[in-house]
Amino acid sequence: MVVETIIIIVIWVILLIISINSLYQINKKNKSRISFKESMDLTELPVITFINNNVKLNFLLDTGSNNSFINKSILNMLDYKELNGASNIIGFEGNKIKNSICEMKIEYKDYIFDTTFNIADLDASFNVIKQEDGVQLHGILGSLFFQKYKYVLDFQSLIAYMK
């Protein structure tokens, strides 16, 4: 009788641990979700707002770009570390562009993302987007960001979530 009671208690403890772990995983997954629904509703562009140095930064989500970019004109307000070397980018017309690179932490809710950015003068492009769509962009997050942090873009639900 005592052995059977101990076995039942052990089974209940195991089930309790499994349940707690499952709830933790669900909560973690829900906290890591980043919605871009509002920006899609307003501008039809997938944009997410992050924070660096108490400055709100709007990033366009661009899976067609490998690299991430930060606009050179905003850097004086940000906390970043310029890295040695440069990155060679191939533009739409096939032209090679040499960019400086920096490392910068960007925050979303409780998450901090340490990311490498190409520094580029994006004022002309971003001004056109601001005039046409009404959103001020500060940078672009490319596919290497999504790969590094295991984020998937779900355009049906209009969220990015950690896999």
In which residue ranges do the predicted regions lie?
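Pepsin/retropepsin-fold aspartyl endopeptidases
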Residues: M1-K163
